[in-house]
Amino acid sequence: MTDPLALDPVLPVRQRSERPWNQDLPHDERFAHFEAHVTAGGKIEPNDWMPDEYRTAVLRFVEMHANSELMGVLPEREWIMRAPTLRRKLALTAKVQDEVGHAQLLYRVAEDLGKPREAMLEDLLAGKTKFHNVFHYPTKSWGDIGIIAWLVDAAAIVAQQALRDSSYAPYARTMQKICWEESVHIMHGRDVVVTLVTGTASQRELVQEALNRWWGPLMQMHGPRGDRAKDRDLHWRIKAKTSEELRQEFLTIYVPRLRELGLTIPDPELRYDDEAKTWRYTEPDWDELRSVVTGHGPRSQDRLEFRRLNRDDTRWVRETVLGLQAAAA
């Protein structure tokens, strides 16, 4: 794996302090220098001066990503004890551990932007902040676990790979590690799916039925089409691609792979338009997406309640550790 710091070296504090936007200049001049630097492909470090709009946008983006990693383990966690073999149990356990680790990394990135981790977790559990739509749905079979690990993680990594050049340097560096580990998760998921589709007729049907249920949420996952010119996350280079660009990339890669396995994609309108060089598909249900991510999904409240109970049960551990740290200070 390439060293993330080699891709995005952290400048010494003295050198960064000499940057124009870190100088004692009028706000408008600072803003102009900052905006020009970001637009030209430059990186921003936590100790740099940054406009409130930028800080707020990065924090919101990273916080939702962290929430999604933390909540995203729950659909798969439920299947660790029901995995069909010891090897599958170990692989699924390792995947869940990776995802929790990603959440820890991302909350740490977000903390540097001024919001304490406790506040982020409280907001998540109170339903004040969001997590990705796909983690609000139930997992009904082992086929779901294969589809999640292969296709949900694939849709995620399409977006995450575009974040490796985020203008906020700590986020970009963190994405190097996360993308590498997610690529392993995708291989695990594909192996589960291939094993099932090459097994018995009932095993193959398990995967097809799971794909039928998950296709809608998958197509919603990157969000509705938006106006590139009005997208402030694109303006600040927090992300690099529009929702539709990500969805098109996902379809280009994974539609052929699904068809290669003989699986039927549950969208009769799905086709590639050679003239327009784009995929045509049934418009996703955006009202459903908005309802789900605001806490009205099939398992939204169950998953949040699990996290609340888990947080209460482990409160004594946090209090003990913080007490020991305070005593040693």
State each model region's role.
Residues M1-M50, V317-A329:
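Extreme N-terminal leader/anchor segments
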Residues T2-P12, E205-A329:
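Extended, helix-rich structural scaffolds rather than catalytic motifs
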Residues W49-Y54, G72-A94, A156-Y171:
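Helix-loop segments that flank and shape redox-cofactor active sites
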Residues F135-H188:
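Internal, conserved structured core segments that host functional sites
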